[in-house]
């Protein structure tokens, strides 16, 4: 009796699902090959459907009052996150390991908050291809300008998206916008928030206009 053979080629963006490294996969043989391919495909879809986490890393626990603003925004949008303290100078190996394994551990965006020399965002960006957002912290007599310039002046090829000094809320919103590219529900929440902000401004305009128009 002739043995029936199966050949399955499942590719997403040119990469075989059975070989994430990008190698060609030729599953030709018995039915086991079919089920292996299907199982891999199921796990791939599961990974696509689960929302990625946001990593918030601060160089010191003294940055926490600023970082809390980012935490509040992420909670408002129901985006999963983790908060860690890692120093680019005091714990360089741990910071490198965290960045290297970030994608594997389910993170989609990294937010890094640091003051003064503020090398944290750059050190993280050097060890991951995930988007990195830097928050310069006002932590010295230079009112955060030192941290801003340290964070924003990255060499070509290692980008860091830098928000304003102590701009943690915008850092979280930018992280959400990045995740929303593949998430219709998050996109809807962002659109609704923008619409509400516009309505709030117009209502304030109406109130102020009425108040001063009555004075004449």
Where are these regions (language model features)?
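Cysteine-centered motifs
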Residues: 16-18, 25, 37
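Glycine-rich phosphate/diphosphate-binding loop of Rossmann-like nucleotide-binding domains
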Residues: 52-90
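C-terminal binding/interaction regions
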Residues: 58-65, 69, 145-216
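N-terminal beta-loop-helix "entrance" segment that forms/cooperates
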Residues: 83-104
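Glycine-rich phosphate-binding loop
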Residues: 98-136
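Short, Lys/Arg-enriched N-terminal segments with co-localized hydrophobic residues
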Residues: 31-50
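Short glycine/serine/threonine-rich phosphate/pyrophosphate-binding segments
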Residues: 63-67, 91-95, 114-123, 142-145, ...
